[in-house]
């Protein structure tokens, strides 16, 4: 009976493939869907509110006012910790703006307290001790008179900037947003229960000293129960929520209910916490030293200007201020009235899985719920595939073994397609790296379509197309073979989803979404018998795949927008094209994995593969032309970090064994100095890796933990003319005493110098650092922290010398011979410090597509 039915069905709906010329239209349909839906929604921003509209739109964020303040901030120029601009002018500016808010505040409803915090302290920051002296924060507490809540909501951002950068996007944008949010709260009749603390952080770029000063020492910090951290890795656009918690899923519920323009994903959180993104934020300080749970949000658009002199007012749109302001204002009002704030610990259990859909709505659920969903849809997909295969045996003359065998072949082809879909883009990245052609997409990001996406799509479809073309005639209809390809992809995704779930990765939700819509399509096809009616099942599949296609193309477009600018500052050791290739490959697999095998519905599918290969070839030719040169002046710059260094090495007897000058390069991207060689004379440039075995810290004044981590990949360009350092860094031995027992000696020092200094310590053979006046964390964990030790020191408004002592133990107790090396670096990072004439000329000789973050530095090495 079943065979009779199928014979009639096949008679009415023969399995004839469609003409080949429809295949390009099929693929172009999905491309058109991306540009018609995803691209506009990704770039959608709200209409900004003007000051003269405030009376008709009470309680709304006014972007025009925030923009005016941002322009004033921009005109002030760089704000470097230790400079008068940051420590005096900016503090006065912030206090003036805060007083303007107080002047408009509803005095009958609210109280405002303002405090300028000056603090000194230290903590372990990655591989160094991060010390600070007299750094400043401007702190405001806004509270409702009728409330007696002792649970505060903390909102943090920073106004200091990187050397050479005005910092209008990072993070002046967030500072003015906070000021306008404060104004709207203070002038509104809509009160809030929990006091709100606005922390205008004056030392974030140090790194992360102002936040530590607040959370470890400020009088209000013990009452801060939740956090909204605001930062930026770009200038303008939509801010992304990329970290939450840890735990405390109630915060995600408030974001879902309050955020008018949601933009968030669990995947971003896991990528950031894995260290793939070369950045850090104050969120970690509040999390680790509070601990204060919260939400970490950052601007991400136009990361090309981040930490450069082109981070200016003119690249930030007013509507981007409106977007962030509306989200922040609504979120603050929601959390400011949250019942959970009374006892946050009672609501702390469980991580969240969270994401937005095209910025239209936000989804979150508990990690435990996510585990259940992932397992259910993973197993459900496998079960439905088994039902479909059984159904095929009922409508053909084949037994279950034959159908299972055919499906087994399809599954092997699926594994091959996955390997190719990942492998071909990665292979492209490797080839381009071998030819010194990395970052060709850096300015013209559309090049990734031909370089990485098309090869991935070819990999997805090639094994199946070859099999369908070359296989002998089979009793299994072609339409069933195509369904088996989708089934194989479903089973593969189900296995991956379950494995990632077991591994504790919440990003497994991506595979669950893909399975959800395929399971839906398969259910419809089974219940309606469309799977047995020629190719009609593919229409249901395409309709059900529209939603996941939109989501995955939106998500991975967002990741490319965020990550492509970061490839120019990921360092020299890792090929950045690998990251972009993997993102393109994973996005292609998830967005198109069920769709592109359907080109085999059309005749001559190998022509479609040839067309994709031709597109790849054309894009390759374009990429090796001038179009593929990564850098452009002002908009897509090459970052070159270098110091103008004067070095002096003292031996144990006080003699000088080395005194020289040169340029110390901490190169930021994979192309090294090659793009500069046409304009700059690099004769004598040496790789420092060879010096690292002979000299402590490779003999250079690496700035912070990132510079020190990359020191073996650094370059040194000797200079005949001595570098003129605009100041003096002095280390003075105050006293040397032998302690009781005779095997330990104490050395007491005084260090004087600029606002940024580093101390490097290396005990010699047979000597152990027993104690010191710094934090003991390094000494208490010798398995983690090994010599040479790095102590980073910065001061804000107090340049007083620091005094410290070192206690060293020696096996033979002989302290009349060399015991340890100590290196002292002084960094004059501010733009107000004068560069000598040769350095100025060197900077001017750099190509116009270069942004140089540079400053003079001294490095003195002593042996005691």
Model-predicted segments: where are they?
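Short, low-complexity, Lys/Arg-enriched N-terminal segments of secretory-pathway carbohydrate enzymes
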Residues: 1-14
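Alpha-helical transmembrane segments of integral membrane proteins
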Residues: 3, 25-40, 377-705
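Start-transfer (signal-anchor) and selected internal transmembrane alpha helices
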Residues: 11-33
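Ser/Thr/Pro/Gly-rich low-complexity linker/stalk segments immediately outside membranes or between
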Residues: 41-61, 631-639
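Soluble extramembrane regions of membrane proteins in the secretory/endomembrane system
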Residues: 48-364, 765-766, 771-810
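Extracytosolic and intramembrane catalytic regions of membrane-associated proteins
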Residues: 92-129, 133-139, 175-176, 257-260, ...
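C-terminal domain-closing interface element
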Residues: 218, 222-240, 372-395
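Cytosolic-side membrane-insertion boundary helix
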Residues: 346-382, 397-407
């Amino acid at each position: 009976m079943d065979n009779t039915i199928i014979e009639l069905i096949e008679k009415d709906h023969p399995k004839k493939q469609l003409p080949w010329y429809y295949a390009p239209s099929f693929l172009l349909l999905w491309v058109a869907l991306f540009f018609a839906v995803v691209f506009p929604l990704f770039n959608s921003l709200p209409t900004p509110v003007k000051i003269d509209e405030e009376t008709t739109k009470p309680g709304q964020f006014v972007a025009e006012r925030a923009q005016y303040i941002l322009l004033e901030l921009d005109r002030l120029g760089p704000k470097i910790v230790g400079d008068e601009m940051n420590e005096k002018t900016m503090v006065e500016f912030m206090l003036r703006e805060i007083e303007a808010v107080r002047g408009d505040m509803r005095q009958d409803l609210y109280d405002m307290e303002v405090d300028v915090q000056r603090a000194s302290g230290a903590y372990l920051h990655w591989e160094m001790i991060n010390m600070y002296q007299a750094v400043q924060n401007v702190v405001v507490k806004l509270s409702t008179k009728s409330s007696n809540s002792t649970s505060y909501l903390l909102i943090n951002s920073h106004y200091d900037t990187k050397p050479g950068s005005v910092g209008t996007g990072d993070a002046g944008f967030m500072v003015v947003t906070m000021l306008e949010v404060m104004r709207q709260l203070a002038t509104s009749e809509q009160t809030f229960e929990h006091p709100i603390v606005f922390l205008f952080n004056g030392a974030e770029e140090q790194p992360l000293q102002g936040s530590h000063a607040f959370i470890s020492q400020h009088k209000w910090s013990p009452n801060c129960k939740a956090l909204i951290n605001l930062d930026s890795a770009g200038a303008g656009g939509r801010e992304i929520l990329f970290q939450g918690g840890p735990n405390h899923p109630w915060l995600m519920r408030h974001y879902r209910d309050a955020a008018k323009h949601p933009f968030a994903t669990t995947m971003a959180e896991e990528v950031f916490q894995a260290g793939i993104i070369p950045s850090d934020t104050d969120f970690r300080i509040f999390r680790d030293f509070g601990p204060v749970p919260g939400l970490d949000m950052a601007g991400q658009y136009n990361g090309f200007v981040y930490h450069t002199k082109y981070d200016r007012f003119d690249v930030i749109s007013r509507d981007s201020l409106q977007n962030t302001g509306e989200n922040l204002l609504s979120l603050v009002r929601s959390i400011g009235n949250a019942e959970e704030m009374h006892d946050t610990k009672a609501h702390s259990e469980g991580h969240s899985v969270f994401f937005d859909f095209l910025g239209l709505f936000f989804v979150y659920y508990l990690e435990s719920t996510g585990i259940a969903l992932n397992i259910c849809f993973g197993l459900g997909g496998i079960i439905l595939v088994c039902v479909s295969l059984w159904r095929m045996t009922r409508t053909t003359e084949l037994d279950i073994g034959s159908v299972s065998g055919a499906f087994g072949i399809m599954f092997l082809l699926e594994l091959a397609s996955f390997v190719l879909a990942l492998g071909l883009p990665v292979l492209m990245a490797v080839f381009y790296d071998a030819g010194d052609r990395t970052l060709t997409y850096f300015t013209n990001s559309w090049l990734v379509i031909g370089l990485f996406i098309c090869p991935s799509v070819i990999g997805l479809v090639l094994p199946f197309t070859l099999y369908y073309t070359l296989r002998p005639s089979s009793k299994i209809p072609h339409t069933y073979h195509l369904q088996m390809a989708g089934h194989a992809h479903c089973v593969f995704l189900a296995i991956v989803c379950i494995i990632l779930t077991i591994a504790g990765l919440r990003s497994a939700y991506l595979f669950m979404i893909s399975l959800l819509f395929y399971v839906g399509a398969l259910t419809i096809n089974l219940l309606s018998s469309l799977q047995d009616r020629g190719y009609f099942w593919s229409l249901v599949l395409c309709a059900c795949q529209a939603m996941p296609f939109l989501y995955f193309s939106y998500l991975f477009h967002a990741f490319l927008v965020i990550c492509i600018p970061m490839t120019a500052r990921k360092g020299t050791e890792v090929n950045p094209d690998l990251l972009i290739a993997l993102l393109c490959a994973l996005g292609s697999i998830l967005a198109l994995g069920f769709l592109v095998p359907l080109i085999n519905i059309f005749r001559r599918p190998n022509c479609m593969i040839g067309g994709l290969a031709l597109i790849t070839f054309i894009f390759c030719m374009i990429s090796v032309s001038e179009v593929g040169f990564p850098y452009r002046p002002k908009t897509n710059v090459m970052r070159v970090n270098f110091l103008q260094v004067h070095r002096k090495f003292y031996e144990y007897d006080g003699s000088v064994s080395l005194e020289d000058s040169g340029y110390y390069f901490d190169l930021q991207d994979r192309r090294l100095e090659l793009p500069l060689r046409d304009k700059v004379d690099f004769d004598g440039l040496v790789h420092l890796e060879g010096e690292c075995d002979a000299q402590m810290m490779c003999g250079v004044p690496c700035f912070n933990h990132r510079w020190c981590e990359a020191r073996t990949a650094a370059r040194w360009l000797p200079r005949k003319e001595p570098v003129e350092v605009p100041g003096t860094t002095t280390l003075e031995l105050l006293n040397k005493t032998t302690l009781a027992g005779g095997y330990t000696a104490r050395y007491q020092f005084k260090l004087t110098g600029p606002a940024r200094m580093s101390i490097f310590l290396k005990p010699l053979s047979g000597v152990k650092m027993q104690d010191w006046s710094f934090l003991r964390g390094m000494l208490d964990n010798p398995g983690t922290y090994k010599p040479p030790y790095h102590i980073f020191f910065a001061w804000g408004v107090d340049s007083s010398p620091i005094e410290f002592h070192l206690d060293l133990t020696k096996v033979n107790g002989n302290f009349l011979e060399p015991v340890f090396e100590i290196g002292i670096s002084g960094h004059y990072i501010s733009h107000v410090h004068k560069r000598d004439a040769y350095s100025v000329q060197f900077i001017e000789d750099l190509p116009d597509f270069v942004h140089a973050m540079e400053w003079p530095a001294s490095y003195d090495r002593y042996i005691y």
